[in-house]
């Protein structure tokens, strides 16, 4: 065990966390972790299976007197995000994670810690290794490649798991029980255009919106943050109605799962309108700044002269593009009827003028209800098809709708109250979890997701709040002790 982890409690959990942090396990490169899990099972004479995707399942029989209880699946993912500070010398495919204790926090030395979801893996291993914990039949499942596409959960075939209840150990706030997540899909539109000449004596300028807060397009979609792409589209729509405008370039947004922070377009208008468009831009900027005065305190608007461009997007395609960007839905579409949570949303993620005289627009839709996700994807698809674009809706991944009658939720809440004297928070998340895929492949599987407190995940600032590991460990043991008998 790492020197800094010798004294951490619970010892049985941190012993295994230290072990697996010596094993390189980048997403899509989990072979050594799979081999470790298989050897772990052999050494303890536990039944072990691996499916064709690389997911590993280890079964353990019930302790005496618990044989008639429902089978519980405990699930975590074996891969980790591999990020390091620029100055740090570290090879994620060879080196062991170096850890240190900072007060109540466990950190890594300039790299991701791997507690997402290594601490979940460690708790499963500690349970499989223990001889003094009461439980019914259990299946410990370790999925691969969660971080870069959920491919382990995607590839899992129905029947691989056989339990009645699933405890997902991949949440990041102790005291919170997650019972719902959104499914998602990407919708991409592609416009073809004919390059045209810009008339003589036209003023070329670049408009840019930047410095926005941004954030996750699911988790942060309810925080009233501005979308840079929609702001840009709004200005272009107004300018198109007033000026003889040519669109020469547009580069806006970025990742499909991020609220756009920056957007830029290069345009041309008659030279006589040069000063007028500057006034319009300033007035427009003031309006938008007032609208988002609370959430966008660092938003910046720029208009700069540009050198002349030889070509622009043909007028008809430019008009259809701008009008569609103005019209297409962005943000929350509906809220859940079961809890205070966004149910369905859409994000206008990126707009790119590319080589080959094409403009590519990427959007993403999310919902915890499959039919609602299809509906919002079709709304976006129809808007772009009306404008003559080719549109493709990706296969996507399913959501997980809250079950208000969930037995495992009731058990998790009551055992938490008995242990800690307070109510846990019951929440959903407007983002994807492996539970969404499990709910599709295993209809009727009763699930809840929870875990110890993590901060800075997916970054070298990742850290684990040590005392919460013991709390979650005790909660798991209490849940297992209270699992009901099979019907």
Which residue ranges define each predicted feature?
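Acidic/His- and Gly-rich active-site-bordering loop/insert found
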Residues: 3-105
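Acidic, glycine-rich active-site loops and adjacent beta-strand->loop/helix elements
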Residues: 78-80, 141-149, 171-174, 213, ...
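Midchain, well-structured core segments that form catalytic/ion-binding scaffolds
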Residues: 104-107, 147-148, 154-366
